[in-house]
């Protein structure tokens, strides 16, 4: 048997809007069937009975309210209306104009007014227990009661207040059950008229389960219609049943007999089933309107009505509730709201450690535990949706994610703390050794932790330096000022926005017509368009700007600082704290005294902070002991007595501590007596001259009259000084670290900049030494400086490259001059070209490229000099048969004379600069003399050797045909300075050779009057032999120029194809004498097409492949032939022989075009005699030189036309390594 306790539950709500207060009191009642349905009571109750209102078809025992007036009278009770408000509501408010109606407005439901019930003060027989709901609640007990009563059809709880809001009116009312009203005449009475009823708990539980199963079936049929806008489904209605059962506080009395319970068993069951079905329908209808409040009201109202009939069914497994554990609706609502608020705060990261309302329940409260267990399921609570619209299922998931994340963060923090604790424990003894007293000031900045940090910073700086040096090793980024990785050591590229290619598409032109695909990893092939590096918007700052930035910052710091102090290694920090180790005098307030001080002191340089701090702590300890011994501190003039000699002749002890860098007795530079002994002696003298035997204190010395200069006299000031020392030292250390980092950055930038500039200069030197196309050298250098973000300008002059590195920050430039003798080395040129392409395509760094380039420059040639002499001799031997009509007997003589020329060129000339200047002239004189001597040899009346073939073949490799070609290419590429110089040099060089050939032939003619006078070979080999000699010449000329064996196939193929075209074109032209430049242009065009296709499709070095073919095409024998004719004519004229008009034109055409020899009829001999005599004059050699220039121009046009056909748009990424 369950009984209610004698204690009362009083709920007090406070409203800030109208400052009213209401108290709900639940008094003890002897009736065990008392229902706690709250209604207000008025002190002026008219006793109106509402029993005539309609009830449901089955009469259910309806609770009634007993109104207790203020004077204790108990008027007639009125049953609670279950329908809409009647007329008595308006009558009551019409008779009480000072009362106000309180309405409950919910979405989708009409406003309902409560019936007229006056408010009054209830009589209480027992004590009162007050429950104050939490302040954060969204719904008050009045609102919740209105929801329950209105939805269940029992009426509405009305909130009333007086018009005067200044006074807080306390209204107390008592709700008691009364006998159910008699049914009206028009309605039948229910099957049970008993005033109380009660069913067994087992029946209540089974009935509740049956109702849940039927309601779930109805919910499955109306799933869509029963889901509200906030995502709350029908299942929430049933999930809350377990929680809502605890609302019911109805308990039956034990006095009721089993027979009475059995008699009432059937009728209540039927009525409860109908009531449940009605509430399910109400829930579905209200859900369709989207009204969460109405849904909750309907459910809670149904549960409240069912609880009043069932006597309080509980969840399965719950224990019997006692009257002590019974909760009011306010308590349950507060507990539910508190739990939901707590969960919402946990989800939002604002977990509250206090649960409001939890103090109202005792630990042994069984029902409270059961209710709390139900409330722990966030999904089972529908009342929470009146507070927030967050679906609890999603809320739980989010809460779990947040909890997991917090747990991970907590574990991580715990690991970090553990590591820090271990590290701190490791360094604990070091810190403890320097902190021996309670007033130790600041901790030592030279801890192991800071040393480790400095080591890490040093490592980071080294990595940064390494990365800066190899910055372009990765994809080059041109940062703007807005970028996070903006480099302060850069300056805007002045010529970037004026470039004509700024808006061009960066897609590589090599992809047009690229029929082969190769990997670009080794640098020997052209990478794809993704590797293209656009021109930089910013260039690296110059060395001068970086140095000025470094020095100006130092000077700026010194000028802005009033005190310049050097610490440690003597580096000026520029930011001097006002108090450093106590070396600067301070005022009592701690401000520094502005007076001149030495910028450098030995004391601050020798000792570190540890030693200073130990000395300072020792002084503090000594002064503490001295203070304990002498409670009364002596005055300043008493120090003279302590320093005077004692009667025994022993001077009194005087404590004077001298610490390096810490001057307890401060002095300034202007004082002549800076130490304490000086003014102590002065005080002794003053005391002795007083005449009073020391009774009158001596005058205070000037050095101590200023309060600021008084020595530190108490331990507090020493402690403060020690503290300030640590702080100032840390500040200075931070400034020093910042300065060191800045210096390291600037130093690294300067080193990196110098390394890049050095690489550019080395690359320029290598390209010039190894024979890169001179008309494209400036383009190569510009591409290299662009990729390295160096602002460089280049001007090429034959034999010299002028380089200017600009600095936009200081508007200055640094001029560099690269001078070297231009040569040809095809193997090293290919290696240099690979490095150049890898750098330009951002595949390797400057450091690696510089090392590889230095290795190339230091490396020896591929073939030794003696082997090159052999190759040179063989080359001169095979060129004579196909180019100068040489015979088989002429080949050995050409090889011998060619070896002489090769020896002087390869071995002698590089070792003697003096001889190098006259090498061409001396060799031409010697070879011409020897060749005529060999040609003069006769056997049986014939000459087995040809003077013209031997002389021209021996000098073929050193003739200026390649020089003339390079000058012509430079002029064609608008390089006017280099082209003009080189072309003029080629003409003068030709005249030098002509002079040497003429002089050699004339000298031998003077010596031998029987010298040969033939300027052509009477016989020649079959033209089919040229198929053998042309590739052989290309082979040996490539080896002389240090070509690799792997490069030879392409060279031989291209040179052979070019000569074949030239041969057949010359054979089919009617007048090849006057069209030599045409045949040369067509042959050069063929070589250019094949070489550029080899570069584009095969990704090889086009220049190296084309060079032997160009050597075959260059008119090497033009100048020698004209000079030879002039030499023979002059020699014969000197000896009186006029027969010098043999087939001159035939030999000129042959040497100019390297075509088939055109035979001249003997009938034309007299016609050509005049031309021969004219060419034999000194001006004839010059005319032939100009003929050579015409042929070179034809070759130039053919090469440029071929390049235009293969590369119509040029190459933006890297320069064309072709002619």
Curated annotation (Swiss-Prot):
Family indicated by similarity: Belongs to the ThrE exporter (TC 2.A.79) family.
Leader peptide range in chain numbering: none
GO cellular component entries: membrane
Region listing for Disordered, in residue ranges: 1-273, 303-490, 503-533, 555-713
Location of the protein in the cell: Membrane
Parts of the chain that traverse the membrane: 864-884, 888-908, 918-938, 945-965, 983-1003, 1021-1041, 1049-1069, 1075-1095, 1100-1120, 1184-1204
Keyword Electron transport (UniProt): no
Protein name listed in UniProt: Pheromone-regulated membrane protein 10
Keywords annotated in UniProt: Membrane, Transmembrane, Transmembrane helix
Topology within the bilayer: Multi-pass membrane protein
């Amino acid at each position: 048997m369950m009984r209610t306790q004698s204690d009362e539950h009083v709920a007090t709500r406070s409203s800030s809007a109208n400052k009213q207060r209401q108290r709900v009191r639940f008094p003890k009642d002897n009736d065990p069937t008392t229902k706690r349905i709250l209604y207000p009571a008025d002190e002026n109750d008219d006793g109106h009975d509402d029993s005539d209102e309609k009830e449901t078809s089955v009469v259910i025992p309806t609770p009634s309210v007993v109104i207790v007036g203020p004077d204790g009278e108990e008027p007639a009770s009125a049953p609670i209306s279950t329908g809409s408000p009647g007329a008595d509501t308006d009558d009551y408010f019409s008779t009480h104009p000072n009362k106000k109606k309180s309405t409950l407005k919910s979405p989708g439901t009409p406003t309902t007014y409560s019936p007229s019930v006056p408010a009054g003060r209830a009589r209480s027989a027992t004590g009162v227990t007050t429950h104050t709901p939490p302040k954060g609640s969204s719904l008050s007990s009045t609102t919740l009661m209105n929801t329950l009563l209105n939805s269940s059809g029992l009426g509405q709880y009305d909130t009333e207040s007086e018009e005067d809001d200044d006074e807080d009116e306390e209204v107390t009312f008592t709700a008691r059950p009364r006998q159910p009203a008699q049914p009206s005449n028009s309605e039948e009475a229910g099957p049970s008229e008993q005033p109380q009823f009660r069913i067994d708990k087992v029946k209540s539980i089974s009935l509740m389960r049956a109702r849940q199963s039927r309601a779930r079936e109805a919910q499955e049929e109306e799933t869509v219609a029963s889901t509200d806008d906030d995502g709350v489904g029908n299942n929430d209605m049933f999930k809350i049943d377990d929680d809502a059962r605890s609302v019911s506080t109805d308990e039956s009395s034990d006095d009721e007999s089993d027979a009475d319970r059995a008699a009432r068993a059937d009728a209540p069951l039927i009525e409860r089933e109908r009531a449940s079905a009605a509430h399910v329908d109400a829930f579905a209808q209200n859900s369709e309107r989207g009204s969460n409040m109405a849904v909750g009201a309907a459910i809670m109202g149904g549960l409240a009505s069912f609880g009043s009939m069932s006597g309080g069914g509980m969840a399965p497994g719950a224990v019997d509730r006692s009257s002590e554990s019974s909760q009011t609706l306010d308590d349950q609502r507060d507990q539910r709201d508190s739990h939901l608020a707590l969960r919402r705060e946990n989800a939002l990261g604002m977990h509250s450690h206090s649960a409001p309302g939890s103090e109202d329940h005792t630990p042994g409260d069984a029902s409270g535990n059961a209710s709390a267990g139900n409330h722990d399921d966030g999904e089972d609570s529908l009342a929470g949706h009146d507070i927030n619209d967050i679906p609890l299922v999603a809320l739980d998931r989010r809460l779990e994610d947040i909890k997991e994340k917090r747990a991970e963060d907590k574990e991580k923090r715990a690991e970090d703390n553990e590591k820090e604790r271990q590290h701190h424990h490791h360094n604990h003894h070091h810190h403890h050794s320097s902190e021996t007293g309670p007033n130790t000031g600041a901790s030592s900045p030279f801890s192991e932790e800071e040393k480790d940090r400095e080591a890490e910073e040093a490592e980071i700086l080294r990595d940064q330096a390494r990365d800066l040096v190899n910055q372009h090793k990765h994809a080059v980024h041109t940062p703007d000022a807005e970028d996070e990785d903006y480099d302060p050591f850069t300056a805007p590229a002045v010529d970037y926005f004026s470039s004509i290619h700024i808006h061009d598409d960066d897609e590589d032109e090599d992809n047009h017509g690229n029929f082969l695909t190769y990997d670009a990893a080794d640098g020997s092939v052209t990478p794809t368009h993704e590797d293209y590096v656009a021109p930089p918007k910013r260039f690296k700052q110059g060395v001068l700007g970086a140095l000025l930035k470094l020095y100006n910052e130092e000077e700026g710091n010194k000028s802005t600082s009033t005190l310049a102090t050097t610490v440690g290694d003597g580096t000026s920090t520029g930011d001097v704290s006002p108090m450093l180790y106590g070396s600067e005098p301070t005022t009592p307030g701690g401000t520094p005294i502005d007076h001149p001080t030495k910028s450098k002191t030995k004391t601050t340089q020798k000792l570190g902070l540890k030693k200073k701090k130990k000395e300072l702590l020792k002084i503090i300890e000594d002064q503490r002991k001295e203070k304990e011994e002498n409670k009364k501190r002596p005055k300043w003039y008493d120090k003279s007595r302590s320093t005077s000699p004692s009667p025994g002749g022993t001077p009194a002890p005087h404590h004077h501590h001298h610490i390096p860098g810490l001057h307890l007795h401060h002095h300034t530079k202007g004082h002549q007596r800076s130490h304490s002994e000086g003014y102590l002696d002065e005080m002794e003298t003053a005391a002795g001259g007083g005449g009073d035997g020391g009774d009158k204190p001596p005058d205070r010395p000037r050095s101590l009259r200023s309060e600021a200069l008084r020595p530190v006299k108490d331990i507090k000031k020493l402690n403060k000084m020690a503290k300030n020392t640590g702080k100032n030292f840390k500040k200075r250390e931070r400034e020093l670290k910042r300065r060191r980092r800045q210096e390291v950055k600037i130093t690294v930038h300067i080193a990196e900049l110098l390394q890049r500039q050095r690489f550019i200069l080395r690359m320029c030197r290598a390209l010039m030494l190894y024979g890169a196309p001179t008309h494209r050298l400036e383009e190569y250098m510009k591409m290299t400086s662009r990729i390295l973000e160096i602002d460089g300008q280049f001007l090429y002059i034959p034999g010299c490259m002028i380089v200017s590195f600009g600095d936009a920050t200081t508007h200055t430039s640094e001029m560099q001059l690269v001078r070297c003798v231009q040569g040809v080395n095809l193997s090293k040129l290919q290696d240099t070209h690979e490095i150049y392409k890898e750098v330009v395509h951002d595949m390797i760094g400057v450091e690696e490229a510089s090392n590889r380039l230095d290795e190339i420059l230091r490396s020896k040639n591929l073939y030794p000099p003696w082997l090159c002499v052999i190759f040179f001799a063989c080359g001169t031997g095979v060129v004579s048969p196909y180019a100068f009509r040489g015979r088989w007997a002429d080949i050995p003589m050409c090889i011998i004379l060619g070896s002489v020329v090769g020896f002087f060129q390869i071995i002698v000339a590089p070792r003697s600069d003096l001889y190098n200047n006259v090498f061409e002239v001396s060799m031409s004189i010697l070879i011409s003399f020897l060749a005529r001597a060999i040609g003069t040899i006769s056997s049986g009346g014939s000459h087995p050797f040809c003077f013209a073939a031997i002389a021209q073949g021996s000098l073929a490799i050193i003739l200026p045909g390649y020089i003339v070609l390079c000058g012509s290419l430079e002029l064609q590429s608008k390089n006017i300075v280099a082209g003009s110089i080189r072309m003029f040099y080629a003409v003068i060089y030709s005249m030098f050779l002509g002079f040497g050939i003429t002089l050699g032939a004339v000298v031998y003619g003077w010596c031998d009057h029987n010298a040969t006078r033939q300027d052509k070979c009477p016989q020649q080999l079959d033209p089919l032999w040229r198929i053998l000699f042309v590739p052989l010449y290309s082979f040996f000329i490539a080896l002389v120029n240090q070509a690799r064996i792997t490069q030879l196939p392409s060279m031989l193929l291209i040179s052979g194809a070019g000569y074949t075209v030239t041969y057949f074109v010359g054979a089919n032209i009617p007048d090849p004498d006057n069209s030599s430049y045409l045949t040369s242009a067509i042959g050069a065009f063929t070589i250019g097409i094949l070489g550029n296709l080899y570069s584009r499709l095969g990704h090889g070095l086009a220049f190296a492949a084309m060079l032997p073919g160009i050597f075959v095409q260059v008119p090497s024998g033009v100048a020698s032939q004209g000079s030879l004719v002039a030499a023979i004519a002059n020699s014969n004229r000197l000896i009186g022989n006029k027969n010098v008009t043999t087939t001159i034109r035939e030999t000129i055409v042959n040497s100019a075009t390297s075509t088939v020899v055109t035979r001249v009829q003997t009938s034309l001999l007299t016609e050509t005699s005049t031309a021969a005599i004219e060419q034999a004059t000194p001006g004839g050699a010059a005319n032939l030189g100009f003929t050579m220039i015409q042929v070179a121009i034809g070759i130039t046009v053919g090469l440029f036309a071929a390049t235009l056909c293969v590369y119509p748009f040029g190459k933006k990424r890297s320069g064309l390594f072709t002619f």
